[in-house]
Amino acid sequence: IAPGPIETEMFRAIRPVGSEAEKELLTQIPMNRVGQPQEIAAAIEFLLSEDAGFITGQTLCVDGGGSL
């Protein structure tokens, strides 16, 4: 899993809601928002499931399109 910016206490300490730092970051994310911890957990859950049984050796970017 290669996460993008995720809404955490540490993230918000550096980039408060509405700050210039947050606005600048959001210009680099096509979905125009930061990710939620649950979204990373959901990606991990999928990769651990039988549905992902034939997936090997991959990096899954969970970053709102920031790596495009």
Feature annotation, model-predicted:
Residues P5-Q28:
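A glycine/serine/threonine-rich, flexible loop-to-helix segment
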Residues A2-E7, L48, C61-D63:
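Conserved SDR Rossmann-fold cofactor-binding beta-strand/turn motif
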Residues P30, C61, S67:
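Conserved beta-strand segments that form the floor/walls of ligand-binding pockets within enzyme
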